[in-house]
């Protein structure tokens, strides 16, 4: 079966590999154009583009699926298209090209967390279980019927990055299985059922910790925002990045945002009990262990995160 693969970030690479390893004829790879990366803003291929080049696959570069991209997709003559985090909408004209349509691997248990940041929103919401589904892409936002589902437990210390890494590999297997079922005529899709929730892309502000919130909510927010956009706070008006924090229910006498040593640990007060800082990146400096940073300051008396 001739397959068009569409994807851009690193989480899509395991799916591309899985389809190639399963023996599908990947006739083309659709990905977003090279983007400037790092402080020097060097134009860099997407992880999917780089992997496609290693595999010797034809690549279609498109920031959006416009007329030019549609022409290239049509020329590739795919029987089906598999899409994993491509980063753009697929218009009806493109949806109609493959005879089996487009099959999307989405990292949530639809209809929960429809949108661009399902794993991050799931962690922030405190879900105990999430997962991934393969579904038929259609005009609506993640609304199509579901072919396959897998579940994944959300650990108490999981960041969105760690959870997404696991789902990217288990989801790749699910995607290959779904395409195999389609190829053999054994696939069946069922309409989505259940409560709908939305997962819009995270903004920088989504990582801004509010120390008046309960510690549990702050911990979830920090884990959900890691690695991107990153958890952060303000200190003397400057943005300070933070790694995920640890809950410290044994300490309840710190005011929200106030810092203090507790043995060798650095604690911050919240709206409930304290949390322990793990690593911190002050403005203009590298990430470092929180106790090392605090010892460099000297006294933490009067030091307050905003």
UniProtKB/Swiss-Prot annotation:
SUPFAM superfamilies: FMT C-terminal domain-like, Formyltransferase. Its EC number is 2.1.2.9. The keyword Cytoplasm does not apply. It comes from the Bacteria. (6S)-5,6,7,8-tetrahydrofolate binds at residues 108-111. The keyword Signal does not apply. Keywords: Protein biosynthesis, Transferase. It is an enzyme of class 2 (transferase). It catalyses: L-methionyl-tRNA(fMet) + (6R)-10-formyltetrahydrofolate = N-formyl-L-methionyl-tRNA(fMet) + (6S)-5,6,7,8-tetrahydrofolate + H(+). One of its GO terms (molecular function) is methionyl-tRNA formyltransferase activity. It holds the Pfam family Formyl_trans_C. GO terms for cellular component: cytosol. NCBIfam families: fmt. Belongs to the Fmt family. Attaches a formyl group to the free amino group of methionyl-tRNA(fMet). The formyl group appears to play a dual role in the initiator identity of N-formylmethionyl-tRNA by promoting its recognition by IF2 and preventing the misappropriation of this tRNA by the elongation apparatus. This is Methionyl-tRNA formyltransferase. The gene is fmt.
């Amino acid at each position: 079966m001739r397959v068009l693969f569409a994807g851009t970030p690193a989480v899509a690479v395991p799916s591309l590999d899985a389809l190639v390893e399963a023996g599908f004829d990947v006739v083309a790879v659709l990905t977003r154009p090279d983007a400037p990366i790092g402080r020097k803003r060097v134009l860099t291929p997407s992880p999917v583009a780089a992997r496609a080049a290693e595999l010797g696959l034809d690549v279609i570069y498109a920031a959006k699926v416009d007329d030019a991209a549609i022409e290239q997709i049509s020329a590739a003559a795919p029987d089906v298209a598999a899409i994993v985090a491509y980063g753009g909408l697929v218009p009806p004209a493109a949806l109609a090209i493959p005879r089996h349509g487009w099959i999307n691997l989405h990292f949530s248990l639809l209809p929960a967390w429809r949108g661009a940041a399902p794993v991050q929103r799931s962690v922030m919401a405190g879900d105990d279980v999430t997962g991934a589904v393969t579904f038929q892409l259609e005009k609506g936002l993640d609304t199509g019927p579901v072919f396959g589902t897998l579940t994944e437990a959300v650990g108490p210390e999981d960041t969105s990055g760690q959870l997404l890494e696991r789902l990217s590999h288990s989801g790749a297997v699910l995607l290959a299985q779904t395409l195999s079922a389609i190829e053999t005529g054994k696939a069946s899709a069922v309409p989505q059922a259940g409560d709908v929730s939305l997962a819009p892309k995270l903004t920088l502000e989504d990582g801004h910790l509010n120390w008046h919130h309960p510690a549990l909510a702050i911990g979830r927010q920090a884990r959900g925002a890691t690695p991107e956009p990153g958890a952060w706070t303000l200190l003397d008006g400057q943005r300070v990045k933070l790694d995920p924090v640890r809950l410290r229910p044994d300490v309840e006498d710190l005011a929200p945002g106030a810092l203090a040593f507790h043995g060798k640990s650095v604690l911050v007060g919240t709206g409930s009990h304290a949390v322990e800082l793990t690593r911190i990146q002050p403005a203009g400096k590298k990430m470092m262990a929180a106790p090392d940073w605090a010892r460099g300051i000297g006294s933490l008396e009067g030091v307050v995160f905003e």
